[in-house]
Design a protein with these regions (language model features):
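Aromatic-rich carbohydrate-recognition surfaces in CAZymes
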Residues: 103-232, 264-267, 271, 393-406, ...
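N-terminal secretory signal peptides and thylakoid transit peptides that target proteins
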Residues: 2-20
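Extended glycan-interaction surfaces of carbohydrate-active proteins
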Residues: 64-105, 139-170, 216-261, 302-394, ...
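C-terminal segment of N-terminal export signals and the immediately downstream linker at the start
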Residues: 6, 27-66
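Aromatic- and glycine-enriched pocket-lining scaffold segments that form the walls
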Residues: 261-284, 294
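Short amphipathic alpha-helical coiled-coil/interface segments
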Residues: 77, 203, 293-308, 422
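Inter-helical turn/loop segments and adjacent helix faces that build the functional surface
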Residues: 186-197, 277-292, 409
């Protein structure tokens, strides 16, 4: 994600207070296992957890061990999220903002974050006059639909700094997890008919906008015009390409002979969105439209596999305007799996190659703290790791998305390992920061804490591990 204006100082101080050290906690075998593998024992101060503002009045999961760090970190994560529920000038209902330096919501992640928060509702004590997590989840979708332009474009972001009537937030498409997919999942939880009907109309128009303005080469795939389209700031994938679209207009491609690019992850987002639109159409009794969405989804899926996959590398790459692969092995390949582009049966050979050579390869993406944003053995891996870097750091956003695809491909044991690693790292450093070193699990310190995705990673993973 792109660096944004910091939260108001009062809110930053509130979040900082949540991260102050509590009494030293004993180091459990679970919380320290990742470090003892490297012969290191974390200091008690490094594992200091936040103190919740009020005693919890809702049940907690049955945590994997008796280590009190679980409960303390759990309460601290809930407090971070409560502090990040804000009202935007351009939308009347409170939303869950990104937190840390990101004072707003982004289409690539906010809908999923709202959804995950909604699934935690039974653990969140209701507060008078405050929205429930499911109400926040609804707002994290409806805010984007409310700001949709007449031509169908959805905003990439809506920020606390945006004034009413501003045209900000439309300078890139910045999508990863399809908003259509998360809104469908939310509908399955709430059976909110108004949400379903609004989402179906809005997401259909968004798909049409992308067809019109992001398929200039008429390939049927989705084109990337700038770095921020994919939210992969400072990734070598986009070296030499402008961060923003010209004139902050997502319809305009920069005048570069290698642009626009055919992007596998953006195309996968559209694929996942069309699958969700088909489900919505069926729920609305629009059976002919369901068939059309499924056919369109299969069409773009086929194009991703035939045009953007490199069998020799077992990786997915951008294809530039000169029909050359941009051979940077990035988290793009994992994003393809995130939308289930590979059929577990029909595409088993491709999946097995991708899994073995890239995703589960300890020299590539299966780092001690998965998943790095670039393969460990990728020559362009960026070190030392700067803040907000998709050039190598393991990002909380990528971790939060893992449960969307790993069980689908039968990788539950590996998901459990990933969740254990992330929970252990977060309990050591309970500031809830954006990213960490994939080799050590050390969070990037220049990133301020209070980052909603990191808090959600801990809460969602702790809950899932309690069922294991």
């Amino acid at each position: 994600m792109r660096m944004k204006k910091s939260l108001h100082r009062r809110d930053f101080l509130k979040q900082t207070a949540l991260a102050t050290a509590s009494a030293a906690l004993p180091v459990s075998p679970f919380a320290s296992f990742a470090q003892t593998q490297q012969g290191q024992t974390p200091a008690a101060g490094q594992r200091a957890a936040a103190v919740p503002p009020h005693p919890p009045t809702k049940p907690r999961p049955h945590f994997p061990t008796a280590d009190p760090a679980w409960a303390v970190t759990w309460d601290a994560a809930l407090a971070v999220l409560a502090g990040n529920v804000r009202t935007l000038p351009r939308y009347d209902h409170p939303v869950l903002v990104e937190g840390s330096t990101y004072a707003g919501i982004w289409q690539e992640c906010a809908p999923q974050e709202g959804l995950v928060y909604g699934t935690l509702q039974k653990y969140v004590a209701p507060q008078p006059g405050e929205p429930t997590p499911l109400q926040v989840a609804r707002a994290n979708h409806m805010a984007f639909f409310a700001q949709q332009k007449p031509d169908g474009q959805l905003p990439a972001s809506i920020k606390l700094a945006d004034k009413v009537g501003t045209d900000a937030g439309y300078g890139q498409i910045q999508m990863v997890v399809p908003i259509a997919a998360t809104v469908w999942d939310l509908f399955l939880l709430t059976h909110d008919q108004e949400l379903l009907e609004t989402a179906y109309a809005a997401c259909s128009r968004w798909d049409a906008w992308l067809r019109q303005y992001r398929d200039t080469r008429k390939t049927g795939l989705v084109e990337g015009f700038c770095t921020y389209d994919t939210g992969m700031d400072y990734s070598p994938r986009w070296k030499g390409i402008p961060n923003r679209c010209p004139d902050a207009d997502a319809r305009k491609c920069p005048p570069d002979p290698t642009m626009p690019r055919l992007c596998p992850d953006l195309s996968a987002t559209v694929y996942g969105g069309r699958i969700a639109l088909a489900a919505m159409a069926r729920a609305l009794g629009k059976y002919s439209e369901e068939s059309r969405w499924l056919a369109d989804a299969e069409h773009i899926r086929h194009l991703i596999l035939t045009k953007l996959y490199s069998p020799e590398d077992a990786a997915f790459y951008d294809l530039d305007a000169q029909n050359n692969f941009v051979r940077v092995r990035s988290v793009v390949t994992i994003r393809i799996l995130g939308e289930h582009v590979l059929d577990p049966i029909k595409d088993k050979a491709i999946f097995d190659a991708v899994w073995t050579k890239q995703v589960h390869n300890p020299e590539a993406f299966w780092a001690p703290f998965p998943f790095p944003s670039s393969a460990l053995n990728e020559p362009t891996f960026v070190r030392p790791i700067p803040r907000n870097s998709w050039g190598g750091a393991s990002q909380a956003l990528t971790a939060l998305r893992a449960p969307r695809w790993m069980p689908h491909y039968g990788k539950r044991a590996e998901l459990t390992h990933l969740m254990q690693q992330w929970c252990a790292a977060i309990m050591r450093h309970a500031e809830f920061r954006q990213q960490m070193d994939p080799l050590t699990g050390e969070f990037t310190q220049p990133d301020p804490g209070g980052y909603s995705p990191a808090a959600l990673v801990f809460l969602d993973f702790a809950r899932r591990l309690s069922r294991a």
